[in-house]
UniProtKB/Swiss-Prot annotation:
Keyword annotations of the record: Disulfide bond, Glycoprotein, Protease inhibitor, Repeat, Secreted, Serine protease inhibitor
Protein name: Ovomucoid
Kazal-like domain span: 4-54
Organism: Numida meleagris (Helmeted guineafowl)
PANTHER family named in the record: OVOMUCOID-LIKE-RELATED, SERINE PEPTIDASE INHIBITOR, KAZAL TYPE 2, TANDEM DUPLICATE 1-RELATED
Gene Ontology, cellular component aspect: extracellular region
Length: 54
């Protein structure tokens, strides 16, 4: 099972770095920062489906 450590998040701003992750909501997030901010917003209901685009 793929996992991402989001303990340092949320962050006020994310870089434009493109390292896509696919969330359990079937949405592609541009990078870990964008994904982790969404995880925090979802109160932990959002999880990582896999690395790479959905």
């Amino acid at each position: 099972l793929a996992a991402v450590d989001c303990s340092e998040y949320p962050k006020p701003a994310c870089t434009m770095e493109y390292r896509p992750l696919c969330g359990s909501d079937n949405k592609t997030y541009d990078n870990k920062c964008n994904f982790c901010n969404a995880v925090v917003e979802s109160n932990g209901t959002l999880t990582l489906s896999h690395f790479g685009k959905c």
